[in-house]
């Protein structure tokens, strides 16, 4: 339901409880419909599944308005609880090469909001720049930008280029990307003649073996 292990959920509930100074239920007046544990699980469920709040209310035995209040209260607290851990993972990832790519978070067409339609993906949404380690594990995301933005521009506008600036330098750890990131400083793959590639690969392999074992 949440995508997290039971012990991870328990730790998050404990972190939220601490931020609330140990007080979830009001001292006076009407009690909350959900205890803190179920309220956190509800919020995690919606963050993972993006279901309608009315559907979540049916599943958790409460009204849509209760769901809305719970999510508004707990979502920023969950961000606070995970902030330090996420920062530590980012710092570890900055020691080696990373991958970057953009994906479209669908929004549908919104009145009065321009530049949402992505010609590349043939849908309206927000362009999210995501950074992972070489094993594909997420380590960072940028601020959402309109879906019409090309990835090379979104890299800068999202703040990722600034936060990972050292990886975009010639002597940096390296940021691997597809050809949509040409001109950003990211390593965008082989663009020379394919007939030359086998020899280049063997040379690079030999040099790397020499570096490690020589």
Which stretches of residues belong to each language-model region?
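Basic, low-complexity segments
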Residues: 1-33, 185
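Glycine-/proline-rich flexible loop or hinge segments
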Residues: 23-28, 50-57
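Glycine-rich, flexible loop segments associated with nucleotide phosphate handling
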Residues: 34-38, 171-174
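Short, amphipathic alpha-helical "recognition" segments used to contact nucleic acids or chromatin
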Residues: 35-50
């Amino acid at each position: 339901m949440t995508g997290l292990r039971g012990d991870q959920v328990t730790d998050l509930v404990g972190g939220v409880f601490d931020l609330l100074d140990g007080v979830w239920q009001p001292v006076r007046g009407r009690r909350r419909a959900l205890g803190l544990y179920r309220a956190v699980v509800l919020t995690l469920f919606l963050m993972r599944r993006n279901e309608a709040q009315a559907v979540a209310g049916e599943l958790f035995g409460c009204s849509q308005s209760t769901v809305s209040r719970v999510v508004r209260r707990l979502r920023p607290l969950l961000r606070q609880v995970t902030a330090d851990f996420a920062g530590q993972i980012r710092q570890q990832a900055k020691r080696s090469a990373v991958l970057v790519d953009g994906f479209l978070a669908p929004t549908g067409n919104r009145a009065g909001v321009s530049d949402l339609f992505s010609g590349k993906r043939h849908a309206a949404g927000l362009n999210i720049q995501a950074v992972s380690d070489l094993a594909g594990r997420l380590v960072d995301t940028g601020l959402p930008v309109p879906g019409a933005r090309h990835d090379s521009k979104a890299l800068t506008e999202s703040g990722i280029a600034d936060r990972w600036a050292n990886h975009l330098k010639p002597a940096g750890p390296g940021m691997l990307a597809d050809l949509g990131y040409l001109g950003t400083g990211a390593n965008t793959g082989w663009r020379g003649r394919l007939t030359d590639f086998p020899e280049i690969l063997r040379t690079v392999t030999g040099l790397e073996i020499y570096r490690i074992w020589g």
